[in-house]
C-alpha cells in the first residue's frame, strides 16, 4: 500500500480517497473547534497562520508538495487562496442553506485558481464530446500549459507531486489506489453530487508490485469498466459546472479550542461507567452537554447518522437520575424507535450500561400480551415502537404506569413524515404532551418533575418545526443542528442515474442493473467490504449470481479455505456455490443458521461482497465501506413503490466502519427520472411534513375514548398540539388548503376535516354525537381503540349476518387491512396450492375454490395450515405465518368482544369465541394435537403422540409415564413431567337442569359449572392465573340466551359456580345449546344440548305459526364445523278449519310437531261417545281410505286358514277418476324429490279438506294381498327403484332411533310416568328401526339432516311425529305379523327410514286423535285384548 506521507499518485489511478474534511457548523461562530480521529496532540497541530502560508506557497500545480487542506470561506474572502484539491471532485459534502448561492462557476474564478479543473475538463472533453447537459469548453479560459499530463505507469516519477495529507496516519487505516483520469470522467455539478462515468476498455488492473493490501479481495471484472452503450449517456448529467464542495472555514484548532470538548470526568462518579468507552465527548455531544445535563428543557438535535447521537440520550437519562433520589421507584423512561431492531439493539446495549447502577430495562414491541404490563411495572427504561406505545397509551387513564414517565426519548424523529408510521408517532407524542399537562394539573407543579422530551433526527431542513412541536407553553425546546462534517466516518454520497424507457418494467430495469454492479464495486469499494441492497429476495440471489459470473475476486489461500468452510456449513445449495466465489446473499426468508454464517463471514472481513434486502438495514448492524442501493423501487403492498426516506437513510447509514475506516461511500443506482429526487434527499433538503390528515379517523376515535376530545372545539385544540397544525400554517397547499388562507381560515379547514371523520365514526356507531356536537365513545369505539383495529376492518365486520361459520370468519379476517404488508410471491404459489388442494397430502380444513391468486387467499391458506398442524417447509411462509398470527390473535379477540357488545347472533358469537381461542393455541378447536399445547411438546412430538392414539388430555393422563417416554423417545422423567402438566389442567363439568316451574313462554334452567379437580389445583396449576371459561347459551332462533366469563379463581374458591337463567321460548324449537369455551386450551371445551319443556303451544291470536326446516342447529361433532345449518323456511300458517276443535295431543310445540291435527284441529266428536278401541279402529279405517300411494314393496301377510277372507275385496282395482286437481299437484311429486315433501304443510291441509270425497269413492291406496297373481299389472322394478333411491340417503344415518327413544324418555312430560312402560316396549320394537317393509310411505319423507345434527339434536322437525307413532302402536302383535314387519329391519339395523312408517303417521294426522289421558293402567289390558282383533275387523 502506498505510504500515507508525501506519496506520489497519478490521475490515471482508478481509485481515490476522499479527503478528511470538516464542514461549516451551523452556528454563527467565526471559528469552531475540531479534531480528527485519532486526535493528534496539541503540539502537533500547526498554527492557522502557518497553514495559510503553506497554502499560499502551493498555488501552482507543478510544485512538489501540496497539502490536502481546505481554504477559507468564499463568502468571506475572494483572494487567490481558493483551491480545489485533486480528489475534491469526488467530494459529496452538502452545504447549509446560507451557502447555497455561493457555487463557483468558471466565469467568477481566476484561471490559476481552477487550473487543474480546467485541465481535467479539457482532457475529458477531447474524449467525450456528447454529454447530457451543458457542454463545457474549458480550453478557452485556461492556457494550454496548465493542462494536466499523465504519469508514467511503470515509473514512480511524476511531473506533479502532492503531499497527500496534513497529518500522518498509519498505513493500516488508510491505503488505497487512486483514480486514473483516462478511465474516469467525472463532472462536478451544481447539485453537489458527483455523477461518474467510466470508459470501457481503458482501465487497467490496479494491482502492481508496489501495492500492499489491507484486504486481500480485489475485483477484476470481465470488461473492467462501463461502456457508453452499457451505461447510457444519461448517467452523467452535468447541467452546469460549479464547485462540487462546500467551501469551509479554516478551523482554528488551538489549545483553548480542544479544551471545549467535555470530559467524562464532568459526570458524577457513579454514572461514569455509562461512558467508559471514551475519555472525552465528541464535538456534537459536547455542544449538547450543558443543555442536556444542567437543564430540563426539551431538546431536539439534528445530526448525521453515526455521529454519536445515542450518547445524547444517555446524558439525558443521567440528568434524570441525578435529579431523582434513590431508590428510583416512581420514574419511567421511554425510548421510542421506528423499528423493533433498533429497540433490540438499544435494549442489549443499555442493559449492560444501566444494569450495574440499578436500572431495569424492558423491551415492549410487537403484539405483546397484556401480561407484560406486570413486567413493565418494575422496569425503569422501556424500549418500544410508536405503534405499541400508541396501543398502550390508549388506556392510560386506566393505567398509572404511563403517568410515571419522566423522560421520553424519540429516535429517528424525522420518520414523522413517513406516510404509514408518521401519523402514529405524531399522535403518540401529542398524547404524551396531554398526559404531561393533565398530570401537572393534578399534582403540585413545584414538586413534580415534568416530563421531558429529547428527540434525535437525521439532518432535516426544518428541525425548528420539530422543536416547536415538542415545546411546552412556558419553555421552548432547544434545537441543535449539526451538519455532515461531524460524522466520524466521512460519507461520500453518489447518485447514478440510468436510462429507463417507458415500456421497460421495473423487473427488467432491476435486472439490467445487475450487470453494472461489478463496475460500481470496482470503482468505489477501495478493496473493502461492500454491501449491496436489492429490492426483492429473488433479486438478491440473481444479483449475486451475476456478480460471481462477471467478476473474480483475488483471495489468499487462507481466505478461500475459510470461505469453503462457511460454504459447507450452509443449507442453501445456491448460497453454497456463490459463497465459495467470494459473494453471498442475506434476506429474512433464509434459514436462521444460514444468516448467522453469512453475517459472521462478512463481519470478520472474509466476505468481500454481500447482497441483501432492506431488512438487514433495519436489523443486524453490518457496516461496510461501500453501500450500494441497487434500484430505489421495491415491491410493497402488491405494487412497486419508491423506498421511503427512512429506508434510504437507514441503508446509507450502514456505510462506514468506525473501527476500520475514516471514509465511506454510498452509491444509489436509480432511474434518470428520479435522480434529482434522491439528490435532494441526500442533500437533506426534503422538508418534514405531516401525514396525520390522511389517517385522522382512528386517532380521533382513540382520543375520544380517552376523553381527551369531547367536542369539536376541543378536537381543533387537540390538532393544535400536533405537527400537522404547525406545518399547515406554514405550507397550507401541501394539505389541500388554499395558499392564501390566514390562520383562522386554516383552522376552519382543519375543523371541517375533523367533522368529516367524526361523521364517519358516528355512522358506524363508534361514537355518539348530540346536537351540541358533543361526543361520547360507544363500546364498539372503545374496543376499536383498545385492540388497535383500523376503521376499514371495523367497517368490514359491521356487515356480518350472524350465521357465519368458522370458514366464513377466517375468510373475513384474511381480508383485513392489517395484512396489507403480506405479499403473494410467485415462488410460493405451488406450496400454497398444495396446502389448499392435494389428493395425496393432508390439506387445509376449508379448501378454497380455484388456485391461490390473491393476498387474501394466501393469508387464509396459511391460517388454516397453522391451525391444522400442517408443516410448512418454506421459511419465508413460516415468517409470514408468524406475522399473520400476531395480528390475527388481536383481531379475533377484538371480534369476539365486538360481536358480544353488538348483541349479534349466537352462531357468530360462538364461532368468534372459538376462533379467538384457536388463534391463541394455533390449533383447530377439534384438533387431535392437543398435546402440542403442553410445554416441551412441538409439532414433531405431538405427531408421535397422535400416532399412538393419545388424542385427548384424558388419554394422555391415563397413559403410563414410561410408555409416554417410549412413544416420544425421551428419557425419564420426561413422561412424568408431561403427565403432571396434564394433571394440573382444570377439568370442568357442566350440569344443566330445568327447574320445575313451567310456563307458556318462559322456562328456568339451572346451570352449574364444576371444577372437578379444584382441590388438586390449590397447590399447582398448569393454566395461567388469567385463564377463564366462557359460558354461552343459545336457542334455536340463533339468539344468545346467556353469556358469562367465569375465571378459574372464582371456581377455585368453592369448586363450582351456579346460575339460575330464565329462558324465553324460541319460535323454531325448544332446544338450547350450552357451551363452555376455554380461553386458552383446546380440548377442555364442553358442549351440551337441552330440550326445554313449556306448558302450552306458542299461539298468535287464532293462528298457530308452524315453522319447519329453518331451525338453527349448532353441532359439535369431532370433525364437523361449528356451523349454522339453515335450510329454507317453508313454514306456513295453517288456519283451523271452522267447527274443528283442538286435538288432545300433548305435543311440546304444536307448531313444530308432525300432526296436522295440531295445526288445523279435529272435527267435533259425535254425540254418541265411542269406546276407546272402536275409536281407534275407526281411525285406522279412515286412514286406510285416505291413503293414496301404492305400496313400495309387496305385503305378504300370512293369514290363518280358518279366517274367512274374501281376496277379491282386497284385489287390485283401477282407481276411479280423481278430482279436477291432480294428485301430482297435491303432492308435487313430479317437481320435488320425496325428501322435500315433508316441508309442504299445505298438502296436508288440502287432503284434510276433502276427506269425504275420498271415503265416498272408496279408493284404497294401500292394498294387501296373499299371492302374486293380483300384482301382475304393476311394474315392480320401477316401484322398488323409486322407493330405494330415496331410502339410500337416509339409511346412512345411524343410531337415530335410539336417540329418539332416549329423548322421549328424557323429556319432562306430565304423563311420563303413566306412559313409561308403553314407551319402553315401543322403543324395543319400532323405534329400534323405522323401516317397515310391510308399510308404504304415503306422501312424505323426513327432512335430510347431517349426521352430526341428528346425533346432537334429538328433537328435530319430525321427531315428535315418530314419538307419537310409538305411543300409538299396538304392542301385542301376533308373532307372524312381527316377523314380517321386521324383515327389512334386520337387514339394516342402523337405518332410519321414515318412509315406511308414514302409513301410521298419516293416521295420526287425520280424523281422530288419541287422547293419552284416556290411557290408564286399568284399561290397558282390555285394550290389548281388543287390539288382537284389529286385523280381523279390517280384513
Curated annotation (Swiss-Prot):
Q: Which PROSITE patterns match?
A: HELICASE_ATP_BIND_1, HELICASE_CTER
- Its Gene Ontology biological processes? resolution of meiotic recombination intermediates
Task: List all membrane-crossing ranges.
Answer: none
The EC category is isomerase
Region entry Disordered: which residue ranges? Answer: 1109-1139, 1295-1315
Question: Keyword set for this entry?
Answer: ATP-binding, Disease variant, Helicase, Hydrolase, Isomerase, Meiosis, Metal-binding, Nucleotide-binding, Premature ovarian failure, Zinc, Zinc-finger
Tissues expressing this chain:
Preferentially expressed in testis and ovary.
What EC number(s) are associated with this protein in UniProt?
Answer: 5.6.2.4
Q: Does the keyword Acyltransferase apply?
A: no
Q: How is the cofactor bound?
A: Might have a zinc-finger.
- Disulfide bond entries: none
| GO MF annotations, alphabetized | ATP binding; ATP hydrolysis activity; DNA helicase activity; nucleic acid binding
**GO CC terms in record:** nucleus
Q: Where is this motif: DEAH box?
A: 411-414
Keyword Zinc among record annotations:
yes
Which cofactors does this gene product need? Zn(2+)
Swiss-Prot/TrEMBL catalytic activity: Couples ATP hydrolysis with the unwinding of duplex DNA by translocating in the 3'-5' direction; ATP + H2O = ADP + phosphate + H(+)
| Residues of the Helicase ATP-binding domain | 290-478
Associated disease: Premature ovarian failure 9: An ovarian disorder defined as the cessation of ovarian function under the age of 40 years. It is characterized by oligomenorrhea or amenorrhea, in the presence of elevated levels of serum gonadotropins and low estradiol.
What job does this protein perform?
A: Required for crossover formation and complete synapsis of homologous chromosomes during meiosis.
Q: What is this protein called?
A: Probable ATP-dependent DNA helicase HFM1
Amino acid at each position: 500500500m502506498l505510504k500515507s506521507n508525501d506519496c506520489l499518485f497519478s490521475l490515471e489511478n482508478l481509485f481515490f480517497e476522499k479527503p478528511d474534511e470538516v464542514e461549516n457548523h451551523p452556528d454563527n461562530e467565526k471559528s469552531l473547534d475540531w479534531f480528527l480521529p485519532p486526535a493528534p496532540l496539541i503540539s502537533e497541530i500547526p498554527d492557522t497562520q502557518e497553514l495559510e502560508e503553506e497554502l499560499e506557497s502551493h498555488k501552482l500545480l507543478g510544485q512538489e508538495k501540496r497539502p490536502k487542506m481546505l481554504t477559507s470561506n468564499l463568502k468571506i474572502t475572494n483572494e487567490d487562496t481558493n483551491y480545489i484539491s485533486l480528489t475534491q471532485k469526488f467530494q459529496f459534502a452538502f452545504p447549509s442553506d446560507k451557502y447555497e448561492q455561493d457555487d463557483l462557476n468558471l466565469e467568477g474564478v481566476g484561471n490559476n485558481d481552477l487550473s487543474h479543473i480546467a485541465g481535467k475538463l479539457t482532457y475529458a472533453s477531447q474524449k467525450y464530446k456528447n454529454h447530457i447537459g451543458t457542454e463545457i469548453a474549458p480550453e478557452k479560459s485556461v492556457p494550454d500549459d496548465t493542462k494536466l499530463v499523465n504519469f508514467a505507469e511503470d515509473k514512480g516519477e511524476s511531473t506533479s507531486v502532492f503531499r497527500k495529507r496534513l497529518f500522518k496516519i498509519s498505513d493500516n487505516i488508510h491505503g488505497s489506489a487512486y483514480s486514473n483520469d483516462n478511465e474516469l470522467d467525472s463532472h462536478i455539478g451544481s447539485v453537489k453530487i458527483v455523477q461518474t462515468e467510466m470508459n470501457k476498455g481503458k482501465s487497467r488492473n490496479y494491482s502492481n508490485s508496489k501495492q500492499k493490501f489491507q484486504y486481500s479481495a480485489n475485483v477484476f471484472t470481465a470488461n473492467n469498466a462501463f461502456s457508453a452503450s452499457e451505461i447510457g449517456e444519461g448517467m452523467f448529467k452535468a447541467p452546469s459546472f460549479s464547485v462540487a464542495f462546500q467551501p469551509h472555514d479554516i478551523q482554528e484548532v488551538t489549545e483553548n479550542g480542544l479544551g471545549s470538548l467535555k470530559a467524562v470526568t464532568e459526570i458524577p462518579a457513579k454514572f461514569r461507567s455509562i461512558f467508559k468507552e471514551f475519555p472525552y465527548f465528541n464535538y456534537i455531544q459536547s455542544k449538547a452537554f450543558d443543555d442536556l445535563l444542567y437543564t430540563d428543557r426539551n431538546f431536539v438535535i439534528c445530526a448525521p447518522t453515526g455521529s454519536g447521537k445515542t450518547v445524547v440520550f444517555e446524558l439525558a437519562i443521567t440528568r434524570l437520575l441525578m435529579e431523582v433520589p434513590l431508590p428510583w421507584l416512581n420514574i419511567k423512561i421511554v425510548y421510542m424507535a421506528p423499528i423493533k431492531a433498533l429497540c433490540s439493539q438499544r435494549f442489549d446495549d443499555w442493559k449492560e450500561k444501566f444494569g450495574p447502577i440499578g436500572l431495569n430495562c424492558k423491551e415492549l414491541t410487537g403484539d405483546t400480551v397484556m401480561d407484560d404490563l406486570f413486567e413493565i411495572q418494575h422496569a425503569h427504561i422501556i424500549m418500544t415502537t410508536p405503534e405499541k406505545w400508541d396501543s398502550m397509551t390508549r388506556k392510560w387513564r386506566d393505567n398509572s404506569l404511563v403517568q410515571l414517565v419522566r423522560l421520553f426519548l424519540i429516535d429517528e424523529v424525522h420518520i414523522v413524515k413517513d406516510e404509514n408510521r408518521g401519523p402514529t408517532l405524531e399522535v403518540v407524542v401529542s398524547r404524551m404532551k396531554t398526559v404531561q399537562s393533565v398530570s401537572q394539573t393534578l399534582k403540585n407543579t413545584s414538586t413534580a418533575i415534568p416530563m421531558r422530551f429529547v428527540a434525535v433526527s437525521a439532518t432535516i431542513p426544518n428541525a425548528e418545526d420539530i422543536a416547536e412541536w415538542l415545546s411546552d407553553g412556558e419553555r421552548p425546546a432547544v434545537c441543535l443542528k449539526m451538519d455532515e462534517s461531524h460524522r466520524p466516518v466521512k460519507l461520500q454520497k453518489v447518485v447514478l442515474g440510468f436510462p429507463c424507457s417507458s415500456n421497460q418494467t421495473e423487473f427488467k430495469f432491476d435486472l439490467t442493473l445487475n450487470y453494472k454492479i461489478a463496475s460500481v464495486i470496482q470503482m468505489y469499494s477501495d478493496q473493502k467490504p461492500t454491501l449491496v441492497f436489492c429490492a426483492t429476495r429473488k433479486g438478491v440471489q440473481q444479483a449475486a449470481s451475476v456478480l460471481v459470473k462477471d467478476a473474480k475476486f483475488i483471495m489468499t489461500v487462507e481466505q478461500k479455505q475459510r470461505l469453503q468452510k462457511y460454504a459447507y456449513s450452509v443449507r442453501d445449495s445456491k448460497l453454497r456455490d456463490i459463497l465459495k466465489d467470494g459473494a453471498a446473499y442475506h434476506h429474512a426468508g433464509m434459514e436462521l443458521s444460514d444468516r448467522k454464517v453469512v453475517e459472521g463471514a462478512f463481519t470478520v472481513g472474509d466476505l468481500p461482497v454481500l447482497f441483501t434486502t432492506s431488512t438487514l438495514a433495519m436489523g443486524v448492524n453490518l457496516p461496510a465501506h461501500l453501500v450500494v442501493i441497487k434500484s430505489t423501487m421495491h415491491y410493497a403492498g402488491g405494487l412497486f413503490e419508491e423506498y421511503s426516506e427512512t429506508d434510504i437513510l437507514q441503508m446509507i447509514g450502514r456505510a462506514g466502519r468506525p473501527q476500520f475506516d475514516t471514509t465511506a461511500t454510498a452509491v444509489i443506482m436509480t432511474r434518470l427520472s428520479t435522480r434529482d429526487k434522491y439528490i435532494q434527499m441526500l442533500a437533506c433538503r426534503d422538508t418534514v411534513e405531516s401525514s396525520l390528515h390522511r389517517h385522522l379517523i382512528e386517532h380521533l376515535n382513540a382520543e375520544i375514548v380517552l376523553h381527551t376530545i369531547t367536542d369539536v372545539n376541543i378536537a381543533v385544540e387537540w390538532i393544535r398540539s400536533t405537527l400537522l397544525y404547525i406545518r399547515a400554517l406554514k405550507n397550507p397547499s401541501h394539505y389541500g388548503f388554499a395558499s392564501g388562507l390566514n390562520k383562522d381560515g386554516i383552522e376552519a379547514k382543519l375543523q371541517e376535516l375533523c367533522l368529516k371523520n367524526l361523521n364517519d365514526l358516528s355512522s358506524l356507531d363508534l361514537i355518539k354525537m348530540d346536537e351540541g356536537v358533543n361526543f361520547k365513545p360507544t363500546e364498539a369505539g372503545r374496543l376499536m381503540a383498545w385492540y388497535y383495529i383500523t376503521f376499514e376492518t371495523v367497517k368490514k365486520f359491521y356487515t356480518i349476518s350472524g350465521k357465519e361459520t368458522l370458514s366464513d370468519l377466517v375468510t373475513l379476517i384474511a381480508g383485513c387491512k392489517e395484512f396489507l404488508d403480506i405479499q403473494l410471491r410467485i415462488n410460493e404459489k405451488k406450496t400454497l396450492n398444495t396446502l389448499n388442494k392435494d389428493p395425496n397430502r393432508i390439506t387445509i380444513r376449508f379448501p378454497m375454490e380455484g388456485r391461490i391468486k390473491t393476498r387474501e387467499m394466501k393469508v387464509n391458506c396459511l391460517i388454516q395450515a397453522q391451525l391444522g398442524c400442517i408443516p410448512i417447509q418454506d421459511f419465508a411462509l413460516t415468517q409470514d405465518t408468524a406475522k399473520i398470527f400476531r395480528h390475527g390473535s388481536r383481531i379475533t379477540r377484538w371480534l369476539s368482544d365486538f360481536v358480544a357488545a353488538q348483541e349479534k347472533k349466537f352462531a357468530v358469537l360462538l364461532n368468534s369465541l372459538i376462533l379467538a381461542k384457536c388463534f391463541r393455541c394455533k390449533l383447530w378447536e377439534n384438533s387431535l394435537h392437543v398435546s402440542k399445547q403442553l410445554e416441551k411438546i412441538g409439532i414433531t412430538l405431538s405427531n408421535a403422540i397422535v400416532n399412538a392414539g393419545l388424542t385427548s388430555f384424558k388419554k394422555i393422563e391415563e397413559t403410563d409415564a414410561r410408555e409416554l417416554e417410549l412413544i416420544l423417545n425421551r428419557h425419564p422423567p420426561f413422561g412424568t413431567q408431561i403427565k403432571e402438566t396434564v394433571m394440573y389442567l382444570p377439568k370442568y363439568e357442566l350440569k344443566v337442569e330445568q327447574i320445575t316451574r313451567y310456563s307458556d313462554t318462559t322456562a328456568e334452567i339451572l346451570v352449574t359449572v364444576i371444577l372437578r379437580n379444584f382441590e388438586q389445583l390449590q397447590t399447582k396449576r398448569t393454566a395461567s392465573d388469567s385463564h377463564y371459561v366462557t359460558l354461552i347459551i343459545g336457542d334455536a332462533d340463533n339468539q344468545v340466551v346467556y353469556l358469562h366469563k367465569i375465571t378459574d379463581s372464582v371456581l377455585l374458591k368453592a369448586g363450582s359456580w351456579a346460575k339460575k337463567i330464565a329462558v324465553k321460548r324460541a319460535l323454531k324449537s325448544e332446544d338450547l345449546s350450552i357451551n363452555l369455551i376455554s380461553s386458552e386450551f383446546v380440548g377442555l371445551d364442553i358442549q351440551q344440548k337441552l330440550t326445554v319443556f313449556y306448558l302450552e303451544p306458542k299461539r298468535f291470536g287464532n293462528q298457530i305459526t308452524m315453522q319447519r326446516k329453518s331451525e338453527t342447529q349448532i353441532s359439535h361433532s369431532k370433525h364437523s364445523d361449528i356451523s349454522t345449518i339453515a335450510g329454507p323456511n317453508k313454514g306456513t300458517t295453517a288456519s283451523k278449519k271452522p267447527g274443528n276443535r283442538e286435538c288432545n295431543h300433548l305435543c311440546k310445540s304444536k307448531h313444530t310437531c308432525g300432526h296436522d291435527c295440531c295445526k288445523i284441529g279435529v272435527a267435533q266428536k259425535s254425540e254418541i261417545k265411542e269406546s276407546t278401541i272402536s275409536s281407534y279402529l275407526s281411525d285406522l279405517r279412515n286412514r286406510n281410505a285416505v291413503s293414496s300411494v301404492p305400496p313400495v314393496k309387496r305385503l305378504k301377510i300370512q293369514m290363518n286358514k280358518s279366517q274367512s277372507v274374501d281376496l277379491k275385496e282386497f284385489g287390485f282395482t283401477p282407481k276411479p277418476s280423481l278430482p279436477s286437481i291432480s294428485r301430482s299437484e297435491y303432492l308435487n311429486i313430479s317437481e320435488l324429490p320425496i325428501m322435500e315433501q315433508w316441508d309442504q304443510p299445505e298438502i296436508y291441509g288440502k287432503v284434510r279438506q276433502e276427506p269425504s270425497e275420498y271415503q265416498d269413492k272408496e279408493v284404497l291406496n294401500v292394498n294387501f294381498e296373499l299371492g302374486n297373481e293380483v300384482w301382475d299389472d304393476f311394474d315392480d322394478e320401477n316401484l322398488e327403484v323409486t322407493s330405494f333411491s330415496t331410502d339410500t340417503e337416509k339409511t346412512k344415518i345411524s343410531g337415530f332411533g335410539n336417540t329418539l327413544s332416549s329423548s322421549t324418555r328424557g323429556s319432562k312430560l306430565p304423563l311420563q310416568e303413566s306412559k313409561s312402560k308403553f314407551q319402553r316396549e315401543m322403543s324395543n320394537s319400532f323405534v329400534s328401526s323405522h323401516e317397515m317393509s310391510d308399510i308404504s310411505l304415503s306422501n312424505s319423507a323426513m327432512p335430510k339432516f347431517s349426521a352430526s345434527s341428528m346425533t346432537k339434536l334429538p328433537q328435530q322437525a319430525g321427531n315428535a311425529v315418530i314419538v307419537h307413532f310409538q305411543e300409538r302402536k299396538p304392542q301385542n302383535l301376533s308373532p307372524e305379523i312381527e316377523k314380517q314387519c321386521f324383515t327389512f329391519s334386520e337387514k339394516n339395523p342402523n337405518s332410519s327410514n321414515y318412509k315406511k312408517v308414514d302409513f301410521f303417521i298419516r293416521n295420526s294426522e287425520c280424523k281422530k286423535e288419541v287422547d293419552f289421558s284416556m290411557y290408564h293402567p286399568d284399561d290397558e289390558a282390555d285394550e290389548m285384548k281388543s287390539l288382537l282383533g284389529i286385523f280381523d275387523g279390517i280384513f
